[in-house]
Amino acid sequence: MKTYLQSTSAAALAVALFSSSAVLADDTARVSVTPTPDAAGPEAANPLAELIVTAARGPQDPARVGQSVTVLTAADIAARQQVLVSDLVSRTVGVAMSRNGGPGGITTLRIRGAEGDQTVAVVDGVKINDPSAPGGGYNFANLLTGDVARIEILRGAQSTLWGGQAIGGVINLVTAEPAGAFEGGLQAEAGTQATTYLRGAVAGRSDHLVWRLSASRYETGGVSAYVGGAEDDGYRQAAVSGRARVSVTDDLSLDLRAVYTKNRNDFDGFPAPAYAFADTGQYAEIEELVAYGGLNLALLDGRLKNRLAFGYTNSDSLNYDPAQAVTPVTFDSTGRNRRWEYQGSLEITPAWTATFGAEREQASFRSRAPSAFAPSPVAARAEVGIDSLYAQVRGDLSDHLSVSVGLRRDSHDTFGDHTLGQVAGAWSIGEATLLRASFGQGFKAPTLYQLYSAYGNLGLAAEQADGWDLGVEHSVGDGWLVVAATGFWRDTENQIDFVSCAFGSLAAVCNPGGVARFGYYDNTAKTAAQGVELTAAVERGAFSLDANYSWTHTENRSAGANRGKQLARRPEHQANLAATWRWRSGLSATADIRHVGASFDNAANSYVLQPHTLLDLRASYPVNDTFEVYGRVDNVLDDSYETARNYGTQGRTATVGVRAKF
């Protein structure tokens, strides 16, 4: 793992499964490539490339990137053995996770204390945020590491290139590309809670075609979603993905990518007559499709690279309660997003590059909530479009100082025009010290669900944010020790939150049209977040250590009873430490400690989510060039804890597995 501005991690511990080029990471490796405007292109998928692609939607030397970025390569992902992307990303600095139950439960990742729906999630260059989700964010429960070759976590407001919704940051996942004419891999693992995971892939490369196909299946018996429940709530997912790049000429190519998943998760609800959280037989079925088609054209001897693309996401969700009279369906929704875009990258001089583009995003949603009293309600439907223009210029003012400046103009069908800016800089002091700083803005309009669903509020205002960060990184000796510190600040206006209605409330907003409802969405006039991120990485011979600490203080600064209170589910203190020993035989063993401090589950700060510390152990051994065996024990001490009030979490689990490549 590489945390630029935060740290440079120890060398990777194991061989990644699905790429014949995925070897132990070399911290001195450098890859020379021509800038490309594709954040999911071949350089992004290269597990050895020490280049950052998310910050500029094209490759950059990390020493010239002003933003805070953590990079997980294919080798990092394989070494950490996590099946769920959320479990992997939440161990990086500045990221907090909450989950409603075990695997499959609604999962939220918050970057630097921002709300989960203020994070832009991207797979192979396509934004996967769901327009039918309450906040328009992405439920990370259904995102598995699977065929992912690289993850970049970009912290702080990233409006210029990724849209105003990126108030907290961007999580960009890139699936693998082959290195040889034909290659493939298999993985199988099994563990406690009746958990199994199978996946496989084949891929190839020729002069004119690069292709890859993969499939996976994950299933677990899980734990009870209700913390006091007796029956377990399981989860399963089947997934297929593919990508192909056809080189028509040396300057013209076509990219096609797609990922499809089918998910089912059991959950608990609030059954009659008490309507209190309890064991139920409810479950959800979710189908997700992400598709991309792009045409790439290089002009001016490769100095001008153009990309014309269409991205499509579709999410269909159905919730069932077999005990409900008349109809078992309790929720039915569809979210769809179409995105047309042009992006260009012009090498003005060898030291300066401009990235620019235009986008049209069309989001639609349909949602209904049948019940025994209204088994066939009319579905709420809405659609909205956003037109955007953006430009960013980055380059070197000297051998030691690099800067980037960008602007974005969004035109929202409902909330009008908004201009957002961003600036960042990186300054090298000698060979061992690097200073970085950035400023960015965000603008997020209320979602279709927040406006038009049964809990909607047409009086909502758009969220707006300004964010800053300043950091220093220092390397000792030949890089055996790297330490870093970063401070950040963010002010947000009109943050949108869900407000519950008291039982029997007569307030008009709780009884629209004379019909009572459980709650509604409303603005919190002003919130703020500030914090410090510290990292250290040590590599001495066979021993390596990776550590990070995050202090994140959030505050409601609006008038009212909650003024001065912390925002919900934002731990103020978090720390992670991983210590690894590698033997000459190839055997490696890691002890991983995670600490999450106390937080509050609600805006009133009346319920405390207690702090917890978890110990995980993992090991791997390459039997030969083809096979690797591995195993892990998570939550070794079987500690009980909560990340959301009254929701269960996994106790001790054990897993063994095998990887093969050919």
Model-identified regions with their sequence ranges:
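N-terminal Sec signal peptide and the immediately downstream disordered periplasmic leader
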Residues: 1-92, 203, 246, 250, ...
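Conserved C-terminal beta-signal and adjacent last beta-strands/turns
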Residues: 8, 201-203, 214, 247, ...
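Extracytoplasmic beta-strand/coil segments of soluble accessory domains associated
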Residues: 54, 86, 90-127, 149
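N-terminal periplasmic accessory domains that precede
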Residues: 85-88, 105-110, 119-122, 138-143, ...
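Short acidic/polar hinge/loop motifs at secondary-structure boundaries
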Residues: 127-155, 242
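Transmembrane beta-barrel wall of Gram-negative outer-membrane proteins
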Residues: 192-219, 229-265, 283-305, 348, ...
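Outer-membrane beta-barrel signature, preferentially recognizing the C-terminal barrel domain
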Residues: 273-294, 298, 333-335, 382-384, ...
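Gram-negative outer-membrane beta-barrel transporters
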Residues: 396-403, 483, 489-491, 516-603, ...
